[in-house]
């Protein structure tokens, strides 16, 4: 096969993957439907990102730049299209952001021509003046928020080496990077979030609260370990262009022998419904094989986004089947979801909800539900009783109820 024929065969194979129709799994749990195929893998990335198509310079048609994974994607519906800002990880371990677009949200995702060029973070003097920039070694896990101030915000983790531990090449620090855009192509980088501790899991609430920007935070002592950090926090910010956490309180706590014993964090920004705010979060616990990441849900009051009104016990979504396998095993993580039908800022009960999650830090998937089903799940699923005895009592109550039904 000559060089041009090899390219033609490569393009045909790639198009077959991009055009593959996705279908729901035959059986589910009634809460949501998972789909048969991942929506994005490393192989979905454009061939032009990976191959040099010059026969002179690349006679063997080798991949010159290899892509390792597509994961942890922010999501939004824009101009009738379903857009993901994907964390793409190269073989060199560096992550970057790229937009992938779908006409229906469940398949036919295609990346835009080029990755996002994210500007460096401005450095501020004590007087608040910009005096330079600081380039992070790695950036990843963007949460997208279309804010009522008219901007699209992307909040993400900015990782740098911890120079206070010069001899430890694995020592790192995490800060919250902040950028905003009008078109997802040109981004304005704002100064990183200023906080008293490390912040790698921060989400912007879509509305002003008491005239201020509101953040869901995750205070932690180290890059990985939460230490004294108690869970999902809440902070109000006066000026997003000079964002600083001055006061912070925990609104969703970690607890012993639960799915969020080690740490927990907000996923995407919550969805506003007439019943309250729907929240999707991740919880982490330790087990024999390492850290297990799962997704869980909770709801807060419509007039008080910090007041929890419902929280089902246990996990909402976990890795299953082939989802267990990947770079970091036994992980489900989500930082993007989309409610299809929004009226006056509120997702209607009949609205489809697309939940975008990554499995094992390797590939992207979608699960679909509706606002009505997710609200029902949150409001009517038993809470965690925190003791085996309570769990057994809950099951026996349901058994007794079902015995009295003619089904």
Regions found by a protein language model. Give the residues of each.
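C-terminal structured domain segments
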Residues: 334-342
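Donor nucleotide-activated moiety binding/catalytic core segment of transferases
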Residues: 259-267, 330-333
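Beta-rich carbohydrate-recognition and catalytic domains
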Residues: 1-72, 76-137, 145-203, 207-262, ...
């Amino acid at each position: 096969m000559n060089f041009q024929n090899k390219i033609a065969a490569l393009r045909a194979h790639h198009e077959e993957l991009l055009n593959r129709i996705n279908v729901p799994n035959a059986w589910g749990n009634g809460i949501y439907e998972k789909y048969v195929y991942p929506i994005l893998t490393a192989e979905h990335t454009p061939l032009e990102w990976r191959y040099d198509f010059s026969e002179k310079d690349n006679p063997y048609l080798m991949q010159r730049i290899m892509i390792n994974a597509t994961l942890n994607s922010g999501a939004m519906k824009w101009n009738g299209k379903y857009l993901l800002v994907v964390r793409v990880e190269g073989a060199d371990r560096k992550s970057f952001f790229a937009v992938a677009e779908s006409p229906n949200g469940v398949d036919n995702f295609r990346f835009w021509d080029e990755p996002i060029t994210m500007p460096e973070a401005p450095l501020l003097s004590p007087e608040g003046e910009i005096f330079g920039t600081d380039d992070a070694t790695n950036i990843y896990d963007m949460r997208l928020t279309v804010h009522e101030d008219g901007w699209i915000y992307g909040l993400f983790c900015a990782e740098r080496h911890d120079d206070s531990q010069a001899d430890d090449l694995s020592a790192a620090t995490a800060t919250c990077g902040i950028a905003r855009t009008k078109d997802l192509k040109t981004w304005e980088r704002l100064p990183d979030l200023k906080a008293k501790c490390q912040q790698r899991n921060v989400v912007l609430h879509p509305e002003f609260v008491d005239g201020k920007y509101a953040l869901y935070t995750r205070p932690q002592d180290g890059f990985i370990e939460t230490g004294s950090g108690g869970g999902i926090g809440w902070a109000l910010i006066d000026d997003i262009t000079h964002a600083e956490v001055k006061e912070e309180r925990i609104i969703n706590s970690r607890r012993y022998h639960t799915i969020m014993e080690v740490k927990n964090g907000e996923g995407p920004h919550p969805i506003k419904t007439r019943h309250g705010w729907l929240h999707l979060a991740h919880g982490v616990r330790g087990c024999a094989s390492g850290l297990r990441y799962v997704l869980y849900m909770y709801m807060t009051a419509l007039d008080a986004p910090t007041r929890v009104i419902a929280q089902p016990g246990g996990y909402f979504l976990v890795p299953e089947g082939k989802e267990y396998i990947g770079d970091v095993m036994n992980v489900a993580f989500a930082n993007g979801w989309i409610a299809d039908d929004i009226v006056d800022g509120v997702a209607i009960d009949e609205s489809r909800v697309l939940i975008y999650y990554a499995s094992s830090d390797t590939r992207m998937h979608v699960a679909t539900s509706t606002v009505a089903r997710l609200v029902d799940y949150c409001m009517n699923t038993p809470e965690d009783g925190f003791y085996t005895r309570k769990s057994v009592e809950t099951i026996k109550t349901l058994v007794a109820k079902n015995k009295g039904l003619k089904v």
